[in-house]
């Protein structure tokens, strides 16, 4: 079976985790701090806060941005459900915007039509590693005095207008799930250059505790913690962080290798009239966290049948990006919205295998089977 994705993990990560275990300091210790510092340097932010996953990163971003009960946050429905869920967690309402039909990223013009006096923030998503139009949304947020939050779960290593994703705004949330570009088993990170946010985020991830174990460990005097706000247990372990440090060292190489495979797919499928391929706008650099193709209505096989035939031939695939407003959990909450572009893209897109290292034979086999079927 050719898998859809798999992490690039080697002896380096195993030894790093092993070394941490031998220290007996396995959570919120020096490796977490090292990973945060190196990640911030990599993306170009002043600070980074390591967390248990990207969903918790989104949740805390909502809190520090001041989003709460009665507020509205504009976001795409076409995204993994955690995007919208993070808004509900704080008692606010996700207001679903349409996506751009070329990039499948949130459409700035439609988003502007949804702004009301209840709108508190806009949550943009860099879909499967393709940067959204950050400058356009920064301008929109400035115009209406809104907060901008970036769901960059899939976008580690992606570049927007010459700068890494993570350097453009004050709350940028990353994921280290195994399907992402780099992994810590699971994990998340918030990149920020806002010192006030940074201070609050560190409190919130550890039950609102005024000091952490590392500070107390290094002190020559006894210290007693205070819990100054209601917080959460959203901490990353040092075992995960040690793996993350090693993964981060390989990130640019992994992105380069993924792009080489993406180029092969783009070249192989470029003349097939029945499909639409990913679009990388000028000044945008995708890490190709996933490679998604869209099947036009003229395609001789529908998406679900194509997925089944490929599975029968030993090729794992997934549907394209979901639409949250059509999931049972959101239907039960009464969300009814008309988003024809998002719905059509979700119903007609398919994600095909892409990982590092991927054998050339497997790449060619995937190409051959898809070309024969579509």
Predicted regions and their residues:
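Phosphate-binding glycine-rich loop
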Residues: 25-72, 86-90, 96-98, 163
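PLP-dependent aminotransferase class I/II
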Residues: 33-37, 42-49, 109, 121-125, ...
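N-terminal "arm"/small-domain region of PLP-dependent enzymes with the aminotransferase-like
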Residues: 1-25, 30, 226-228, 353
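Helix C-cap/helix->beta junction micro-motif
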Residues: 90, 143-144, 313
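Short beta-strand->loop structural element characteristic of the AMP-binding/adenylate-forming
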Residues: 93-103, 318
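Conserved coil-to-alpha-helix start sites within the AMP-binding
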Residues: 79-84
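Hydrophobic residues in well-ordered beta-strands that form the structural core
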Residues: 69, 75, 96, 148-150, ...
